Regions:
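Transmembrane beta-barrel wall of Gram-negative outer-membrane proteins
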Residues: 175, 187-288, 402-408, 413-429, ...
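Solvent-exposed loop segments that connect transmembrane elements
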Residues: 229-251, 286-315, 356-398, 438-475, ...
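N-terminal periplasmic accessory domains that precede
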Residues: 76-77, 97-99, 119, 144, ...
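C-terminal beta-signal and adjacent terminal beta-strands/loops
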Residues: 673, 743-755, 778-830
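Outer membrane beta-barrel strand-and-loop segments of large Gram-negative receptors
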Residues: 370-409, 466, 599-603, 609, ...
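Gram-negative outer-membrane beta-barrel transporters
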Residues: 495-499, 626-634, 652-752, 822-829
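Short acidic/polar hinge/loop motifs at secondary-structure boundaries
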Residues: 108-109, 116, 121-148, 196
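Membrane-embedded beta-barrel scaffold of Gram-negative outer-membrane proteins
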Residues: 195, 328-335, 339-357, 557-568, ...
């Protein structure tokens, strides 16, 4: 949340990083400063070269270290409003989908591959629906690359790439800072944030053996205790047989973050650099920040409470824990014949959650009651018995996931001082994901569900031997290997006109294993199909894929302008669904009749992008206006849907024919004079299905999805405005300022026609527009800085996401109005 972070570094100009100093005490000085003020040149690495942002013929949004610090940006939610093409489908930090340019086909993603890649330095850490949320402490830059980036960034860079780039050790200076923040949420608790950084050169003058060798270390640490603002209120269970009195609590979505980074840099002369970096982060949340709604089970307000904007009803513990680390090594050589880079990184993540699923299991109970009405008298044929939890279940879900990923990339870039230049490289990654999911029902032993499974066990010679609350367990493992060769060549046809062409040859292998069933090991664990009641034992096999994605870019430069046109493609790998064999998504099998197993595999999908844009500077570099217009065709879309068969309740991926996505992105930066700075971004996006689809056309549960069906999650309009005024006189020996930020998020829908939850038919919701206003005032000196702020001044209650996951629809909301302070002490150096 944007309520606990840093003010600007001491000595930094606060007016949008104006390169000339603007502090003055008289009108003559102010006029001189106005003439000298210039917008800062931001260097980005979006093309895997160091280029000025205004010289990069791509749609790139860059948020610098100074702006991250000044605006107190901590995580995805804090900066999503500033990037025109970026959207989030968020349940909680560490469990969200990052979406660029409208490439979303479902509200919640449980698939294996995303449409937007997320990079931490040189390594992809993308995880569809489960993206980690690196805390932005001592981060050099955020880069958001709009549109397909498949040629340089590969799989999942289908519609864009989000890059988080950390600061590296500096061998030239000792530097550091200490930072403390505190804040209070008007309808919640109070929080604190402590962080610090130390940079120390070790060999400034080299050594006797290697006189040109320099070294430095950079150490970063942080701890944050973030308050909650959602209350778990006293509520009867859906069956009205008990209440959640033992779980009632205030501010249940409080959280703790801590972690750090250690970096070592070696510089051998001016040509060679080695960086070794280790990053660690831990995140724990005591409850989820989604609220309950008076609909479905809770519709009767004569029985259930009338929920307020920050109220929820939970009957078991909600909990989220996310822990990960990354170790990375990068070697860079700047040689006479070009630049070479060799980078490798290892990433390891463990995440666990508990989630109340009482309302969800109550829906299953009602389905079971319906099927049991057709019982023939033989308990084995009581097909609804497996959902008989005694009438009024209290239940929770457990999920534990471990991910490790190793990548290596080598690339060579030619010098750029001639008429042509090129970059070529090779990439390899190996990722393993092991996941265990359990659904647990209190007092399951003795219920109809237990008796049904026990009877079935006797029937097949595997009787149950002990009591258990474990109703369902799934184990889902995958091993993914990717390799690629990529390259781009640029030719200056004239002094001003450049053509760039490139592409990526890729090869992907993915092996899947799924096991799921009931009463697993009686007391938890993983399925052992020799003794447990299994649905899908064993190896699901593998999927292999090879292909090529191209890119062509044309750019023309004037003195203060650049125009460009791009054709590019992005891809997302195909695969196989992890489902039980009765499902249409299950593995092919002779055990069940069609349609079982008929939709087990799904193909890769492709985005074809046509884009034009311009980057311009005016008024002696005091006004910057950039714009990009894109038309994208999304072919063979991977869509998450629920099996339409009765009594199956299984999700899988299917391919839809096509969608069209059109949009505009705009960026404005303006320095009216030495004291004012204004920044604005605007994004418009329109995505819809361009071909009709009848989902499950050959089954009784066929669902027509018409042309014009809106793609979910991404708002139709986004606007962000930042205005800053720096007072012309000093105060307490420093430079005082006032800053306002305004963010508008337009309307969107939460689901693609509701197809990911067919059985319980939660409504497709139009998520309303919302806006926030933040005000901050501060002072900066060479030695320290301080600020006071109010976030969400108008106490806007934004509808972030209507979550259909647990059948009982929930709403994720933004943080209410908060008041805070920040103090930073500079330890010296720059």
């Amino acid at each position: 949340m944007a309520h606990d972070r840093k003010n600007s570094t001491a000595g930094r100009n606060l007016s949008l990083a104006i390169s000339a100093a603007v502090a003055g005490t008289g009108s003559a000085q102010a006029e001189s400063d106005a003439e000298d003020a210039r917008l800062e040149e931001v260097i980005v690495t979006a093309t895997k070269r160091d280029l000025k942002l205004q010289d990069t013929p791509l749609s790139v949004t860059a948020i610098t270290d100074e702006e991250i610090t000044l605006q107190r940006l901590d995580n995805f939610e804090d900066y999503v409003g500033q990037i025109p093409g970026l959207a989030l489908s968020q349940r909680e930090p560490g469990a969200n989908s990052v979406i660029m340019r409208g490439c979303a086909a479902q509200g919640l993603s449980f698939s294996d591959s995303a449409t937007t890649s997320v990079y931490l330095d040189e390594q992809p850490i993308t995880s569809a629906g489960y993206n980690p949320d690196p805390r932005l402490v001592d981060v050099a830059r955020i880069e958001a690359l709009g549109g397909p980036q498949g040629s340089l960034f590969g799989d999942a860079a289908q519609c864009g790439t989000l890059r988080i780039i950390t600061n590296k050790p500096d061998t030239s200076v000792s530097d550091g800072w200490l930072d403390v923040s505190g804040w209070s949420i008007g309808e919640g608790g109070a929080g604190t944030d402590l962080s610090g950084m130390v940079n120390v050169p070790l060999l400034e003058d080299g050594s006797s053996i290697y006189p040109d060798l320099k070294a430095a270390v950079r150490l970063v640490g942080f701890y944050a205790n973030e308050p909650g603002w959602v209350d778990n209120v006293l509520t009867p269970t859906p069956g009205q047989t008990s209440t959640n009195s033992n779980r009632v609590d205030d501010d249940v979505n409080s959280s703790v973050w801590y972690g750090g980074r250690a970096g070592l840099r070696l510089e051998a002369g001016e040509n060679w650099t080695v960086d070794l970096t280790g990053i660690y982060q831990y995140y724990e949340m005591d409850g989820f920040g989604d609220v309950s709604l008076n609909q479905q089970h809770f519709a009767d307000t004569s029985v259930f409470p009338s929920f307020g904007p920050h109220d929820q009803a939970r009957y078991t513990e909600d909990y989220w824990e996310d822990e990960w680390y990354q170790i990375a090594l990068t070697l860079e050589g700047n040689l006479s014949f070009g630049d070479v880079v060799l980078t490798t990184a290892y990433y390891d993540r463990e995440s666990t959650y508990l989630a109340d699923s009482t309302s969800y299991l109550q829906n299953f109970q009602q389905v079971g009651d319906y099927f049991r009405s057709f019982n023939t008298g033989n308990p084995y044929y009581d097909t609804g018995g497996i959902y008989d939890f005694g009438g009024y279940p209290i239940a929770n879900d457990f999920d534990g996931r471990q991910t490790n990923n190793w990548v290596i990339e080598a690339r060579y870039a030619t010098p750029t001082d001639g008429r042509w230049s090129a970059i070529v490289g090779a990439f390899y990654s190996k990722r393993q994901v092991d996941e265990v999911f359990m659904s647990n029902v209190e007092g399951l032993t003795g219920t109809g569900a237990f008796n049904y499974i026990n009877y079935a066990g006797y029937y097949v010679g595997i009787p149950m031997k002990s009591a258990s609350n474990n109703w369902w367990t799934g184990v889902y493992d995958s091993d993914l290997k990717q390799s690629a060769f990529f390259g781009e060549v640029s030719v200056d046809v004239t002094e001003n006109f450049t053509i760039k062409a490139g592409g990526r040859f890729y090869s992907i292998e993915n092996d899947y294993i799924v096991m799921n069933g009931t009463l697993i090991g009686m007391n938890g664990g993983i399925p052992n199909c020799a003794i447990d009641y299994c649905y899908a034992p064993g190896d699901l096999g593998s999927s292999d894929e090879n292909g090529f994605v191209p890119m062509v870019n044309f750019s023309y430069r004037w003195e203060n302008a650049l125009v460009y046109a791009t054709y590019s493609e992005g891809f997302r790998r195909g695969g196989a669904n992890s489902a039980r064999p009765q499902s249409v998504f299950g593995p092919p099998s002779d055990l069940f009749d069609d349609p079982a197993g008929t939709m087990n595999s799904y193909e890769s999908d492709t985005v074809i992008n046509h884009e034009i844009g311009a980057k311009t500077e005016w008024l002696d570099d005091r006004l910057r206006f950039n714009i990009s217009y894109y038309q994208m065709t999304w072919e063979n879309i991977q869509v998450q849907a629920e099996d339409p068969q009765d009594n199956i309740f299984t999700l899988g991926i299917v391919n839809f024919p096509e969608a069209d996505i059109d949009g505009v992105e705009m960026w404005v930066s303006w320095l009216p004079n030495a004291n004012w700075s204004i920044e604005a971004t605007v994004g418009r996006n329109d995505g819809e299905l361009s071909q009709a689809q009848t989902l499950f056309a050959d089954t009784p549960g066929a669902i027509p999805v018409p042309v014009g069906t809106e793609l979910p999650i991404v708002p139709d309009v986004k606007r962000h405005l930042k205005v800053m005024y720096q007072l012309p006189r000093t105060l307490l020996g420093g430079e005082p300022y006032i800053m306002l930020r305004y963010t508008y998020t337009g309307e969107s829908v939460n689901s693609l026609a509701g197809i990911e939850s067919i059985s319980f038919s939660p409504p497709v919701v139009q998520q309303g527009s919302w806006r926030t206003l933040d005000i901050q005032a501060g002072i900066e000196t060479d030695a320290w800085s301080a600020s006071l702020y109010v976030d969400n001044v108008t106490d806007e209650n934004g509808e972030l996401f209507f979550n259909n996951r647990f059948a009982q629809q929930r709403l994720t909301v933004n943080q209410p109005r908060s008041f805070g302070f920040n103090f930073r002490y500079n330890l010296g150096g720059k």
